[in-house]
Structures are given as C-alpha cells and as structure tokens.
Amino acid sequence: MGENIEISTKVIENQEIRFRCYKADSTKIAVLAHPYAFLGGSVDDINIIALSKKINSKGFTVYVLDATTRRSALLSGKHDTMIFTLFVKYITSLNHPEYLLLGGYSYGARISMHKSITLAIDKRISHVSYLFLAPYLGLGSSILSWSWGLGFESFSTDSKVLFVWPDNDEFTREGTFETTLAKLKNRCPETTPLKLTDCSHMLSPSSRKILLETVDKWLASALNV
C-alpha cells in the first residue's frame, strides 16, 4: 500500500523537500502534487495513491511531493510551486529520464500547471507529458496557487496531456473546465479529455475505476509504455 511507504527527505538549494517515492525504472519519472494541505490534502489521499500505483505499474518511478509541512499556511501556493520547481529541476538533471510525467489532483493539479515548473525541466528530456485530475480552477485559484494564467504557453506543443474533470465538481464549474480544456488543446493538440459523469470532486469508487482504466490505456497509447 502506498500509505505504508515511508516519507523521504531531500535538501535542495537549502529547501527541505519531503516526498513519497514509488520506485521503478529511473528512465521514466513522474512527479505528482496532492490536494490542498490546508484542507487536509496529503500524500495519503486515496486518489493520489491510486494514481501513483497505476503509473508505477507502467514502469515509472513516481514521486509525490509532500506539502503538509505547511498545512497551517492558508496561502501556500508560492512555496508549493517553488518546491515542485526545485524538485523537478533536481530530479531531471540527476537522472535525465527519457519520459517525464507531471501533474496532480485538485489544487495539486493547478500547482503543476505553473510555467516555472515546465521551464525547470532538463532540455535533454524528449518526452514530457501531463496528467491533470480535477484541477482546482474555481474562485481564488490563481491566488491560492500563486499563478496568474495557466502556464500552458510554456508546454511543448507535442506534449501528451490527459485532462480529467468531474461533471459535478463542487469547486470548479464545468464551463471553466471546458474553457481550460479548449486552451490546452489549442496549445497541445494531443490532449485527451475525460469527463467523469455523475461524479463529484472526491471521485466515487466507480469513477476512480474509470479513471485508472483510462490512465492505463493513455499511458500505453500516448506514451507507448
């Protein structure tokens, strides 16, 4: 179980970064961010664990960054984005993976869209993809994530993207998801949309099953892994 994997710590540029690592092939790396720590989000989130295990089963070493050390900070977006950026810069320059997958769930998905993260990627990496699960795009999301604009302009136009949203999300209107998807597809034509019907932000077991089946097929077809 993912929740039984110990949290590791690495100091990068004087910043202590905590993460959970699902180990596999170092030529394929995924870095994910969990939901908003101030509201209880953590590396133990059921959807983050499920995603991590699925991606790991396809041969990726998966790192889930732990932002709970700043749980008391309401506006932690600037810090969380910095940590994600530093870690991506470090891990890609260390391992030079052939495949890099970035993303997250809810607030974590919004953080992972930040252009500073994409710009930190080692330029020698040939395959950079993104997986966004129910990104928080509602009122105040720019302030919470410390990001004005979505950062898609920094994405490579040949990046593969899986964009997933629930049709009954409590925090983001469906119209906002659809507008964001259109912008994303305009930048990255190879974007795969998945709308989870009759589904809330938290995801039911049946919706989670559909998500994981789609992720499995998407990784196999889009990334050939």
Swiss-Prot record:
The lineage of its organism: Eukaryota, Fungi, Dikarya, Ascomycota, Taphrinomycotina. One of its GO terms (molecular function) is catalytic activity. This is Uncharacterized protein C959.06c. PANTHER family: AB HYDROLASE-1 DOMAIN-CONTAINING PROTEIN, ALPHA/BETA-HYDROLASES SUPERFAMILY PROTEIN. SUPFAM superfamilies: alpha/beta-Hydrolases (SSF53474).
